[in-house]
UniProtKB/Swiss-Prot annotation:
This is dCTP deaminase. It comes from Paraburkholderia xenovorans (strain LB400). InterPro entries: dCTP_deaminase, dUTPase-like_sf, dUTPase_trimeric. GO terms for biological process: dUMP biosynthetic process; dUTP biosynthetic process; nucleobase-containing small molecule interconversion. The lineage of its organism: Bacteria, Pseudomonadati, Pseudomonadota, Betaproteobacteria, Burkholderiales. Pathway: Pyrimidine metabolism; dUMP biosynthesis; dUMP from dCTP (dUTP route): step 1/2.
Amino acid sequence: MTIKSDKWIRRMAESHKMIEPFAPDQVRVSEDGRKIVSYGTSSYGYDIRCADEFKIFTNINSTIVDPKNFDEKSFVDFKGDVCIIPPNSFALARTVEYFRIPRSVLTVCLGKSTYARCGIIVNVTPFEPEWEGHVTLEFSNTTPLPAKIYANEGVAQVLFFESDEICETSYADRGGKYQGQHGVTLPRT
């Protein structure tokens, strides 16, 4: 597998709608002139943005966290430009961008150092061949203080790897449970 360059990412986004909406260059300043956490195309990746829809984890129901039977009431829904994550807690969000991954491609997503250096960890699983949808993002606040996440700014970088051989079975072929997801998607079994 080889990592794909900015030229390939631009070509695939423009001709195959691999990323929508798409920023062909790095964006570091907002439309009103403010400095922001960068997003858009980088040398060998694409920096994704967080939308303004969040699910903030709370344990008001004193429930047990069970990935096979997750209680949706464990979250508080929030919509806004800045999400405050409680100390030692987490929040879910989704990307602004909608992805359509080619059959020969697998992605790996890594959190941006701007957040990591503040104790905020971004976790995303790989985007599998022929998966499509908005990406659900998980932000862990590892600090003993509240932490901010900024909507419509960069939060993580997606790296695209192309195989020299097409996979036998893609995510779409398997009927993956997160195929075509919109909005923040909770665990499914």
